[in-house]
Amino acid sequence: MSNHSSSIPELSDNGIRYYQTYNESLSLWPVRCKSFYISTRFGQTHVIASGPEDAPPLVLLHGALFSSTMWYPNIADWSSKYRTYAVDIIGDKNKSIPENVSGTRTDYANWLLDVFDNLGIEKSHMIGLSLGGLHTMNFLLRMPERVKSAAILSPAETFLPFHHDFYKYALGLTASNGVETFLNWMMNDQNVLHPIFVKQFKAGVMWQDGSRNPNPNADGFPYVFTDEELRSARVPILLLLGEHEVIYDPHSALHRASSFVPDIEAEVIKNAGHVLSMEQPTYVNERVMRFFNAETGISR
């Protein structure tokens, strides 16, 4: 992995610890990668690129507090056919350096537009999980000409509001055993995460940084898209939900998505909770690739 320098801000001890654990998590990355920063109107955005440089682009957006390192069980398969760009979402706990992040849906879409432009991406497939799925949906509704197709996994809100249990478990993260309790809840008591990655997640919880925890905004996230917004989607979408999803009822979310989004394939995956790309990576990797291949005519 090669790193391109950027102006890293002064960090607290917990911030330094987080950066160290992030780098340790990259040891789980099974393929060669390049880590670098790109400039946007909203700050320096950290990206992990893998796969052939001349392959079609695929942009990955992670879940909240998980960062781009969460894709370690998936990246080998996806980067075998695509130039993958795992993007650290601005304003979340990761290596991106936020500046002037208002937290509105418009600004988040413009941030991704800057990312695409500065990576030289005219049009790309996208994959987003949880918070990343919400960002993906927001972007493809506003900039459909830049998205070939999108796999949206366990999106945060998007189709349904959070169950009230989400806030109970999220607010308990900093308590004794709060991280373990939260992760077990999210994954139906089958925490499959590598201990190195869990260490990074814990370090992120302990790193209190206001610029990386934007306040909820009526014009921002979380957000449930209206019927009209969902009907306006012009991009092919694959929606994957775990049968043990806890942030909302997966069957109700699938029903609403299928009722309003014009071009959508939707599926509930067995033996998976919220973090299904890490819980059932073999199936998710293949299912997503099959969807993209059908959209572009690429054969396995």
From Swiss-Prot:
Entry keywords, A to Z: Hydrolase
Record-listed E.C. numbers = 3.1.1.1
Query: Pfam families attached here?
Result: Abhydrolase_1
Q: Which InterPro entries match?
A: AB_hydrolase_1 (IPR000073), AB_hydrolase_fold (IPR029058), AB_hydrolase_sf (IPR050266)
Q: Which reaction does it catalyse?
A: a carboxylic ester + H2O = an alcohol + a carboxylate + H(+)
Q: Its Gene Ontology molecular function terms?
A: carboxylesterase activity
The keyword Hydrolase is assigned to this record: yes
- Top-level lineage group: Bacteria
The membrane-spanning stretches of this chain are none
Spell out the catalytic residues. 274 (proton acceptor)
UniProt enzyme class: hydrolase
Point out the annotated site residues (description: Transition state stabilizer): 130
Self-association or partners: how does it assemble? Monomer.
Instruction: Tell me its family.
Output: Belongs to the AB hydrolase superfamily.
Q: What is this protein called?
A: Uncharacterized carboxylesterase nap
User: Organism classification, top ranks?
Assistant: Bacteria, Bacillati, Bacillota, Bacilli, Bacillales
